[in-house]
Swiss-Prot record:
ATP binds at T29, L30, G31, P32, K50, D86, G87, T88, T89, T90, G413, D495. One of its GO terms (biological process) is protein refolding. The gene is groEL. It catalyses: ATP + H2O + a folded polypeptide = ADP + phosphate + an unfolded polypeptide. PROSITE patterns: CHAPERONINS_CPN60 (PS00296). InterPro entries: Chaperonin_Cpn60_CS, Cpn60/GroEL, Cpn60/GroEL/TCP-1, GroEL-like_apical_dom_sf, GROEL-like_equatorial_sf, TCP-1-like_intermed_sf. It comes from Borreliella afzelii (strain PKo) (Borrelia afzelii). The keyword Chaperone applies. Forms a cylinder of 14 subunits composed of two heptameric rings stacked back-to-back. Interacts with the co-chaperonin GroES. The keyword Disulfide bond does not apply. It comes from the Bacteria. It is found in: Cytoplasm. GO terms for molecular function: ATP binding; ATP-dependent protein folding chaperone; isomerase activity; unfolded protein binding. This is Chaperonin GroEL.
Length: 545
């Protein structure tokens, strides 16, 4: 296919035009007075959102060169959202500001490579300053403030997220689901829960809701299948002597082994229940080892030289409470806290080393089941449109809150970026080249843009307030929702440090790419044939008589 090629100024201008269009669509959502964006859907109701990344994801431009610029900027929003869960609009505004100012300099003949080096130097110093300025958050109230701001100043959502995090801990799993009612509620699962139910309903101890409930029970954790009751007899006899219930977890339990267990359960000779092991493949063994650590037991595995016939009562796990229904099993643990902590640290290390998002998610779930349990936020709303929008806000707020717990918080409303710009003013740049100094200055000017946009969305002229904040004492900022000068941290106007830092670093990365672009190539669109159907051509000599 033939290609269309733009060089030098033409390439950069067309890319910047696309960046500007996407930035203009996204920036209207910034701040407490940010506006909504309505997105048409081919089927169903349109989506209403104030989430920058949701707006960015929808944008495709007709002009292919402009579209390339827009897609690059979209990458800033998506990457920031993936890393920090929020700050997508801030990142978009910063990227456009750096690219716009940078291209002005490139157009005047300054070497873009030098400008990029200056930008990278300034951003590196700025990111370190943001890290140093961060204040650790520990209280439930601080967590609620962060979550509220990320949920577009919805304090109810903020309180629910803080409540969930308080209950399951910072390593616990919090999931967001759609509620069947109009209300937003939280449900909790203590201990470890996994999606494996009993192998026979005859194990039920509660015939009304067909569930099994054991207190102070033993757990046999076996890696392979159990087909013969003979293998199990030694263990069953030992457990029978303690008069305690027994949960058997194995790859599968079948044949006369399952039949004998059901018979003993129905007759009341032994309180017993059998379930299949959770997970698949390598993950199955890891989860069985987790259960063993959680319950203070041993995984009975031939690799360790252990067989069912030689199992001692001390090698069985123990649980305070076990609940099993047809779909799920919940184990509330009594294991050794030191061993659980060691196992948790091992899983955390695996999360850090993993490059797969799917693996990270599964490891995070395992960690949560070990240390905290699971909280489910059920989001409710009156209409489907509102439900989608609200669920999205809750997910964003949850991600941002995790980022805040991880790296701490900084004053919000763009005031931290102004403080960072003032800090960059104090840096000695005498050893930098002229081009690098220009790049350094571009970052300083661009850091003002998010606050300027927040104030503009509130209906005021940003430049006046930015000049004023530079003369105010540290920590003060402009509250765009109440139109007052306040102490940002004390007023709860805070941003996760990770969000602010990631927004700036990702913005500078993409802006640097745009500045150093010298050629852009795209396919030439083929003209569609609009002529009539595909019949045979008429012979010119066969006209009408």
């Amino acid at each position: 296919m033939a290609k269309d090629i733009y060089f030098n100024e033409d390439a950069r201008k067309s890319l910047l035009s696309g960046v500007e269009k996407l930035s203009n669509a996204v920036k209207v959502t910034l701040g407490p007075k940010g506006r909504n964006v309505l997105i048409d859907k081919k089927f169903g109701s349109p989506t209403v959102t104030k989430d920058g990344v949701s707006v960015a994801r929808e944008i495709e431009l007709e002009n292919p060169f402009e579209n390339m610029g827009a897609q690059l900027l979209k990458e800033v929003a998506i990457k920031t959202n993936d890393v920090a869960g929020d700050g997508t609009t801030t990142a978009t505004v910063l990227a456009y500001a750096i690219a716009r100012e940078g291209l002005k300099n490139v157009s005047s003949g300054i070497n873009p490579i030098g400008i990029k080096k200056g930008i990278d130097h300034a951003v590196s110093l700025a990111a370190e300053k943001i890290r140093q300025s961060a204040k650790k958050i520990t209280t439930k109230e601080e967590i609620a403030q962060v979550a509220s701001i990320s949920a577009n100043n919805d304090s109810y959502i903020g309180e629910k997220i803080a409540e969930a995090m308080d209950k399951v801990g910072k390593d616990g799993v919090i999931t967001v689901e759609e509620s069947k009612t109009f209300d937003t509620t939280i449900s909790y699962v203590e201990g470890m829960q996994f999606d494996r139910g009993y192998l026979s309903p005859y194990f039920s101890t509660n015939k009304e809701n067909m569930s099994v409930s054991f207190d102070d029970a033993f757990i046999l954790i076996y890696e392979k299948k159990i087909s013969s009751i003979k293998e199990l007899l030694p263990v069953l006899e030992k457990v029978l002597g303690t008069n305690k219930p027994l949960l058997i977890i194995a790859e599968d339990i079948e044949g006369d082994a399952l039949a004998a267990l059901v018979l003993n359960s129905v007759r009341g000779a032994l309180k017993v229940c059998a379930i299949k092991s959770p997970g698949f493949g390598d993950r199955r063994k890891a989860m069985l080892e987790d259960i063993a650590v959680l319950t203070g037991g041993v995984l009975i595995s031939e690799e360790l030289g252990l067989t069912l016939e030689t199992v001692e009562i001390e090698q069985l796990g123990q649980a305070k409470t076990i609940k099993v229904d047809k779909d799920n099993t919940t184990i509330i643990n009594t294991g050794n806290k030191e061993q659980i902590k060691e196992r948790s640290e091992l899983i955390k290390k695996q999360i850090e080393d993993s490059t797969s998002e799917y693996d990270k998610e599964k490891l995070q779930e395992r960690l949560a089941k070990l240390v905290g349990g699971v909280a489910v936020i059920n989001v409710g709303a009156v209409t489907e449109v509102e439900l989608k929008e609200k669920k999205h806000r809750v997910e964003d707020a949850l991600s941002a809150t995790r980022a805040a717990v991880e790296e701490g918080v900084v004053p919000g409303g763009g005031s931290t970026l102004i403080e960072v710009a003032m800090y960059l003013d104090t840096i000695d740049t005498s050893k930098l080249s002229y081009e690098e100094k220009q790049g350094f200055e571009i970052v300083k000017r661009s850091l003002e843009e998010p606050m300027r946009q927040i104030i503009s969305n509130a209906g005021f002229e940003g430049s006046i307030y930015i000049h004023q904040i530079k003369t105010e004492k540290k920590g003060l900022g402009f509250d765009a929702s109440s139109f007052k000068w306040v102490n940002m941290i004390e007023s709860g106007i805070i941003d996760p440090a990770k969000v602010t830092r990631s927004a700036l670093q990702n913005a500078a990365s993409i802006a640097g790419l745009l500045l150093t672009t010298e050629c852009a190539i795209t396919d030439i669109k083929e003209e569609k044939n609009t002529s009539g159907g595909g019949g045979y051509p008429m012979d010119p000599g066969m006209g009408m008589m």
